[in-house]
Regions:
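Short alpha-helical segments and helix-capping/turn motifs at coil-helix boundaries
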Residues: 64, 111-116, 145-148, 198
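Hydrophobic positions in the central parallel beta-sheet of the AAA+
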Residues: 81, 128-130, 161
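Conserved catalytic network of the ASCE P-loop NTPase/AAA+ motor domain
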Residues: 72-74, 120-123, 151-155, 184
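Conserved motor-coupling elements within RecA-like helicase/translocase cores
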Residues: 112-128
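ATP-dependent helicase/translocase motor core
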Residues: 1-79, 83, 87, 91-103, ...
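Signature of the SF2 helicase/ATPase Hel1-core->accessory helical subdomain module
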Residues: 132-198
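Short, glycine-/Ser/Thr-/acidic-enriched flexible segments
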Residues: 50-51, 85-88, 127, 133-136, ...
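Flexible phosphate/Mg2+-sensing switch loops adjacent to catalytic phosphate-binding sites
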Residues: 66-77, 104-109, 185-198
Length: 198
């Protein structure tokens, strides 16, 4: 019950926001499965229209950002919440940001792709909210930084990636670029090329 009171109940516009059972169950199931299986395992939560998907995403993002393993180290370095539509991005940003008011915990990427690159490489933000369309530009920025010898990269970091509307956002060039950025494949490839040229 303390987890429910401390992690799920939220006051918004003078009213108390309380999870419905399916929302609470979804978040708890993802957290339990992550403890059991660790990072790197795909999970799927399905919601019908109007069932509070944005709140479930927000609660899940915050729960995963606070998750620590048996060694007390965070299981994920960052949680990246991705949507494929700008209109939904604004709504989702407001929902996720509304649950935690600790400065620097959440970064809303609503400007340039450089902002996303900085948030992924930096240490401040625990939850990053962005659109899928920004990742192809981040690959280019990372490659340019690596070529100039200024690459910080994300190699060795663990990301929890929450994709809104996964059925429409998990294929194509943008997703390939997302995987390159978050797995460090592109940075590693660029460094290999630079070493070969030296």
């Amino acid at each position: 019950w303390l987890d429910l009171l401390g992690s799920f109940i939220h006051v918004e516009d003078g009213r108390v926001l309380f999870p419905r059972f399916h929302q609470w169950h979804a978040v708890r199931a993802i957290v339990a499965a992550t403890y059991r299986d660790g990072a790197g395992v795909d999970r799927l939560v399905q919601h019908s229209a109007g069932s509070g998907k944005s709140n479930t995403i927000a609660w899940t993002a915050h729960a995963l950002s606070r998750l620590h393993g048996a060694d007390d180290a965070p299981i994920f370095d960052k949680v990246v919440v991705i949507t494929d539509r700008k209109v939904l991005d604004k709504q989702l940003q407001e929902t996720v940001s509304g649950l935690d008011h600790t400065p620097g915990t959440i970064v809303r990427i609503d400007e340039k792709s450089q902002q996303l690159k900085d948030a992924l490489e930096g240490n401040a933000a625990r939850v990053i909210i962005t659109t899928l369309q920004k990742f192809p530009v981040v690959v280019e920025l990372a490659a340019k930084a690596a070529a100039e010898g200024e690459a910080k990269g994300v190699v060795g970091r663990r990301f929890a990636v929450i994709v809104d509307e996964a059925h429409s956002a998990t294929s194509g060039d943008s997703v390939a670029k997302l995987k390159k950025v978050l797995t460090g494949d592109e940075a590693a490839r660029v460094l290999e090329v630079l070493k070969a040229d030296a």
